[in-house]
């Protein structure tokens, strides 16, 4: 009997629109591009040999729009009758939780940082800097709020009200999807939302996570959800098409996959330098609303 395949899709780093990118020159970390991940989910849906997906999420979030795009792609994949199981890494917060919310099951380690269900947004006003440097700036626009995000001036009252509504609507959309995906009442979600951060164990106690377990536990759960019997051989398939234009899939061995999915305590990170922080936020340039942890937790 031919083996059944369980696909592994990585959501690692800052969630952005467009293609995924590798680590920056100064250690700013890689990005999980919604376009890349959507392509991988579509490929997994269309391959008959693939019976389930394990979504490995290690991300503090990023673009709210990109997170919603990935959430929709996960839901579309599930409508094909194939399950999605999430395996959380060291951090799966804000947008990282958004993309996980509708999974058939969510696994986290007891020390995973997750939750942070909330959105932030705003803009930098350079008006004072321009005045100090003697720079004259003329703005031509058409329409009441056409220049709302111009850096040459702060929000006026009307623009602020419009942007505040946009933030509130996005937050409501986020919490609604958590409520549906986790079979929770809206009031229950509010008690754990509003940006609150939880450990994996605390998240399980609050129904944000199903089980405490590692990557192999998530794979076994995907096998069960897909109805693959214990006597059937299962092969893991790493869907990796970064840098390709044809969406081709590379199949890596279990050893290679496990090396990629080392526990957080065995991964080396370098995101503490100012240049790394600059790279991190540069990747979110142009995004108006963010589903991202607005700080970095460092355990010493």
Regions of interest found by a model, annotated:
Residues 57-62, 91-94, 117, 190, ...:
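Acidic/histidine-enriched alpha-helical segments
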Residues 1-129, 168:
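Cleft-lining beta-strand/loop regions that shape enzyme active-site pockets
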Residues 16, 92, 114-121, 156, ...:
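Generic, ordered loop/turn and secondary-structure boundary motif
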Residues 82, 135, 232-234:
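A structural micro-motif
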Residues 66, 92, 99-100, 121-123, ...:
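Charge-rich, low-complexity amphipathic helices
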Residues 64-69, 202-205, 248-253:
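Short glycine/threonine-rich loop-to-helix capping motif typified by GTGT followed
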Residues 127, 131-229:
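Charged, glycine-interspersed solvent-exposed loop segments at helix/strand-loop junctions
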Residues 1-45, 49, 56, 141-144, ...:
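Intrinsically disordered, low-complexity segments enriched in small/flexible residues
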């Amino acid at each position: 009997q031919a083996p059944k395949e369980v696909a592994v899709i990585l959501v690692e780093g800052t969630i952005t629109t467009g293609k995924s990118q590798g680590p920056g020159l100064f250690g700013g970390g890689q990005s999980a591009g919604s376009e890349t991940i959507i392509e991988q989910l579509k490929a997994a849906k269309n391959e008959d040999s693939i019976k389930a997906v394990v979504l490995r999420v290690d991300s503090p979030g990023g673009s709210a729009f990109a997170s919603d795009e990935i959430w929709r792609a996960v839901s579309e994949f599930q409508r094909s009758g194939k399950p999605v199981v999430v395996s959380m890494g060291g951090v799966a917060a804000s947008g990282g939780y958004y993309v996980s919310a509708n999974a058939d099951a969510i696994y986290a380690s007891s020390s995973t940082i997750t939750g942070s269900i909330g959105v932030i947004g705003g803009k930098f006003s350079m008006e004072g800097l321009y005045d100090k440097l003697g720079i004259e700036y003329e703005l031509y626009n058409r329409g009441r709020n056409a220049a709302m995000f111009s850096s040459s001036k702060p929000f006026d009252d009307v623009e602020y009200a419009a942007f505040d509504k946009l933030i509130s609507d996005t937050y409501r959309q986020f919490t609604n999807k958590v409520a549906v995906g986790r079979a929770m009442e809206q009031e229950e979600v509010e008690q754990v939302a509003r940006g609150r951060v939880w450990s994996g164990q605390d998240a399980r106690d609050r129904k944000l996570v199903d089980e405490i377990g590692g990557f192999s536990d998530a794979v076994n759960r995907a096998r069960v959800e897909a109805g693959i019997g214990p006597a059937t051989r299962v092969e893991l398939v790493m869907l990796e098409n970064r840098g390709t234009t044809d969406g081709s899939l590379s199949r890596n061995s279990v050893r290679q996959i496990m090396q990629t999915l080392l526990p957080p305590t065995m991964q080396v990170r370098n995101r503490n330098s100012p240049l790394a922080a600059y790279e991190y936020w540069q990747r979110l340039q142009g995004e108006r609303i963010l589903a991202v942890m607005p700080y970095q937790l460092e355990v010493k």
